[in-house]
Amino acid sequence: LLNGIQWLIALPFGIGSFIMGAFYAPTVVAGVHHMYTIIDLGQLSKFGVTYWLPLASAANIAQGGATLAVALKTKDQKIKSMAVPSALSACMGITEPAIFGVNLRFGKPFVMGCIGGAFGALFASVTGLGATGTGVTGIFGILLCLNNPVSYILMFVIAFGAAFVLTWLFGYKDTNVSEKTESVEAVGDKSTTEK
């Protein structure tokens, strides 16, 4: 499996990286994402940098972007109070609160986060972004990419921005609020009719 992933991310034009950027978050859901440390260590030993870590970072950041879109779009205070810190946590590389607490709960935000991660990973691959160490992703991952910080920041913006915009436009509808509004309108119409 790991050899297959190594082969995949080595495909030209960032094709494999795009795929792995999309599928990284599902491996977090499955709980097997720590296996990628072997890829990091292998690439560090062979090339002096790891090209895998930026892909994982893009995927994590994107889930944060999707979660923040939900946080800003919802009027449900319970969801908002959970989504805001979860988005920040994801941007620091810890995605479980965002994925399990928000994005998977609503489904589409998770998918939009995967798409955002794919585009961020594609950019990282095309620009040859590599990290000089392993162990930290998200905002603090830039400390491992000081050889090319501008590309890391652009990758962050692309992954986060794509996931945020896609979730805002297509990935989340504040259904609870809509249902309450429709319910109030229905009661109002009924009262008017009875009068």
Please state what every model-predicted region is:
Residues 37-116:
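Helix-loop-helix junctions within the multi-pass membrane cores of secondary transporters/permeases
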Residues 1, 35-37, 166:
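Juxtamembrane interface elements at the cytosolic ends of transmembrane helices
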Residues 1-12, 22-26, 40-44:
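Hydrophobic alpha-helical segments of integral membrane proteins
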Residues 3, 67, 164-168:
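Alpha-helical scaffold segments in soluble metabolic enzymes
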Residues 18, 22, 26, 57, ...:
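Residue-level signature of the transmembrane alpha-helical core
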Residues 4-8, 12, 30-34, 47, ...:
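Membrane-interface elements of multi-pass transporters and channels
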Residues 5-19, 30, 49-55, 75, ...:
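Membrane-interfacial loop-to-helix junctions in multi-pass transporters
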Residues 11, 39, 85, 97-195:
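Transmembrane alpha-helical segments and their short flanking loops
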